[in-house]
Amino acid sequence: MFRLLASSGQVSLRPVLLQHVRNNKHGLGFPNASGVPQSPSSMTSSSIVSPSQFTRSNSSAAGLSESPASSVDSKIENFLSKSAKDPLVREALDAETKNKLNYFKEQIDLAHRYRSIHDHDSERAFASTLDNLSRALEDESLRDTFVSRDLFSYAQVLNSGVYNNRTNRLSGAKNRDSDQYQNQNLHDEVLLKQAVLHLGELITNGEFKAILNAPTLSFLFYSMKQFQLYPEMIHLWENGVNDQQTGQVYLDEKILAVILPVTFEQNRFTYEEILHIYELNTEKLDKVGHELLTSMGKIAIAAGDYSRGLDSLESILQLYEKAQQSHYKNKILASLSDLHLSFIGTCKDIKISKHFFDKVVHYDLPYRVKLKVPHIQSLLENCYEQNEPMDNILYFWRASIAHYNTEQQLVLNSRYAILNNALFTIFFKKYPELNEESFSKLREIIAMYAESKPIDEVFLNTIIGNYSWDSKEVLEQIIENYDVYNVKRTPVSYRVCLKKTGSLESYSNEEILQKWNASLKHLDENKFTYIPVADWAALRDATILSHFKDARKEFYLSVLDKYKDYIQDHRSCIRFVRYWIKRKDVAADIARVASPEPQTFDCDIEIQVPQFRHLRKNINYVKEVQNMRFSG
């Protein structure tokens, strides 16, 4: 049974911010792209359909036939049952369980402590503590002792871990290779995801019903949302709504605020059904909280109901005006910011989006909005879909970069990468052919960026990665900018340039070899002792897996034959070979390189291995492959 609240009477607040949007009849004009603003110093619970249950890899199958050992099992169970009634045994068991609970609480405290310290050792200690907590949670006797606070604390630790791991991953300055085994963020992410799924599974299976509350569920749902576990979220929620004991918890405002946008995005419910759920669950409330108002505003904007979205924004503003405690006011401000960003990134009416965008970059708001790059990415994509002129798109792009440059705190490295990738994806769609206009516009964009901040590797990598013109000369001019602007390069830029040669037929094998050698030289100068998988991938995409593989296949095989022993180790070799085994079209060709007999390849140039200081042979490729074949 959906239990909801009654919203209070019609709001009367009409801030200037909203009036300008509602009363705008003449459109919102765009300045030139260079005009960048300056910064100051009928639904019931019975209609819910439950999908399939969470599955566990270690769960027992139901309905197994009785085995011959069942009588023995029965005797053991009988013995244990009688033993449990013994006071001494019971006391010992209680003491053991108490020790387990104390250990669990100690680990919770440690996790909070480690998470508050931002250094490498604390991150590793947190991961170890999280692993201890996850293992401890496997104990049913421990779970039986939990009170609401214990479950809440664990969910809180998970949510904190998910958020911090994501932040660390996005802010990392290092370009990690996929074959660097010490990628701890990836390891931690897998650990966190497993822990989140396990907790969701336990709750779905009916545990913790007596102690489950909305704050705990909120943390769990937020964690699941970060991992984009949308089907699992919807299933968990629908399963809970239909439970007589816990149904009301799942209809709490805070829970609806998290789950309703997901059900709309995943097409589980229509916009009208979402409104009906909202109305049923809010008709008896004196006021609706800012979290749910924000979510409903977001859904309304996504559905094109901008008037209701503005109503939600006004209602949140009213809550802010009436709020007394500063802590609560700050939470409301966060909701205002969140909904404001939705008008920028989700609204399909670019005039409305621009109005809200300008309010942020001109700092013309009674509340602070942190301009998040996914919303700008979405805005640029919406502009393209609405066939906005390129100059309008450039206005948003350049104003965003200028805005980020004014921020005092460290800007995440991923922010510019996402923003630039969105721009150049659109640029090469709008200008699919090289001509005077398109080339001039590209040069203009590069000059714009250089005026805003120094040309960097990520910027040039993004242009080259999206480059789609059939001109080797122009591509080489772009590549020259690494030197022109004294860009500090990482192995990534060399791989991007090498891979892009696979898109242009005009590159000869000799020119591709030059880029391969340049990449290896950089690796050697940076004390790499092996050729990473990422470099092998760039080479194959430029040659044997390119559109021009017939002319480049033998060249690739020749290079592979010369450098095959430079693969990192046994593990990387297995990974390398298994990739090619799946490619039936070239598997036989690759197998030639592993032949114990010398092979001759029909290559038009000679492949010579330079003298390296650090790069070296790490494996015997032929023996490795032979051992793999022998072991099956």
Swiss-Prot record:
Topology class, membrane: Peripheral membrane protein
Post-translational modification: Phosphorylated. Phosphorylation promotes binding to RNA.
A GO CC annotation given for this chain: mitochondrial inner membrane
Positions of region (Disordered): 27-69
Cellular location(s): Mitochondrion inner membrane
Residue range of the transit peptide in the UniProt record, numbered on this chain: 1-23
Keyword ATP-binding applies: no
Domain of life: Eukaryota
Keywords: Membrane, Mitochondrion, Mitochondrion inner membrane, Phosphoprotein, Sporulation, Transit peptide
Biased composition (Polar residues): 53-69
Record's compositionally biased regions (Low complexity): 34-52
BP GO annotations: sporulation resulting in formation of a cellular spore
Record family assignment: Belongs to the RMD9 family.
Subunit structure: Monomer.
Task of the protein: Binds the 3'-UTR of mitochondrial mRNAs. Involved in the processing or stability of mitochondrial mRNAs.
The protein's name: RNA-binding protein RMD9, mitochondrial
Annotated organism of origin: Meyerozyma guilliermondii (strain ATCC 6260 / CBS 566 / DSM 6381 / JCM 1539 / NBRC 10279 / NRRL Y-324) (Yeast)
Gene symbol of the encoding locus: RMD9
